[in-house]
């Protein structure tokens, strides 16, 4: 597993978050029984930067907490022919962009730690990269159950 982390903001102290994000990504992959080597890029930004990205990619002119950019349908990895796969091959599955500024605001609003919020946003985004969504009530419920299992695995229950 390769995790590339880029702190592109200066408003919130990101000390110690790299290890937490890597743990959250690893726990999500383990919970989903992903055995392939994957690469994930994570960027920490502020509210203004994520607002610009949200407007450009989703047409929504407001800040948000996290954006997920899958690079492939995860089924493409699972359906590849086993004998054609190089054991050393690493699959880049996507990019995660987290507004640390928004994460800090939400942690205060929800009454839990900043670290728990960043871990949750990472898990939520990883599930999107793995093909989950929350467009329907059924999808939302399934995704929430998955999030809770991973957060429990991390010891970060509500």
Swiss-Prot record:
GO cellular component, one term: cytoplasm
Binding residue positions for Zn(2+): 124, 128, 134
Keyword check for Signal: no
Pfam families recorded: YbeY (PF02130)
Statement: the UniProt record of this protein carries the keyword Nuclease: yes
Compartments reported by the entry: Cytoplasm
Cofactors demanded by this protein: Zn(2+)
Domain of life (superkingdom): Bacteria
GO MF annotation, one: zinc ion binding
Family that this chain belongs to: Belongs to the endoribonuclease YbeY family.
Role description: Single strand-specific metallo-endoribonuclease involved in late-stage 70S ribosome quality control and in maturation of the 3' terminus of the 16S rRNA.
Protein name: Endoribonuclease YbeY
Annotated source species: Caldanaerobacter subterraneus subsp. tengcongensis (strain DSM 15242 / JCM 11007 / NBRC 100824 / MB4) (Thermoanaerobacter tengcongensis)
Encoding gene (name): ybeY
């Amino acid at each position: 597993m390769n995790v590339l982390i880029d702190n592109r903001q200066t408003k919130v102290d990101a000390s110690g978050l790299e290890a937490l994000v890597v743990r959250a990504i690893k726990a999500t992959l383990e919970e989903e029984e992903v055995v392939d080597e994957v690469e994930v890029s994570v960027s920490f930004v502020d509210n203004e930067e994520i607002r610009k990205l949200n407007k450009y990619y989703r047409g929504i002119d407001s800040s948000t907490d996290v954006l997920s950019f899958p690079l492939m349908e995860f089924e493409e990895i699972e359906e590849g022919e086993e004998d054609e796969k190089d054991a050393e091959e690493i699959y880049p599955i996507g990019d995660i962009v987290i507004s640390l500024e928004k994460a800090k605001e939400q942690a205060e609003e929800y009454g839990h730690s900043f670290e728990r919020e960043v871990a949750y946003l990472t898990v939520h985004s990883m599930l999107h990269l793995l093909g989950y969504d929350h467009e329907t009530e059924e999808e939302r419920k399934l995704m929430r159950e998955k999030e809770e299992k991973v957060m429990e695995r991390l010891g970060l229950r509500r």
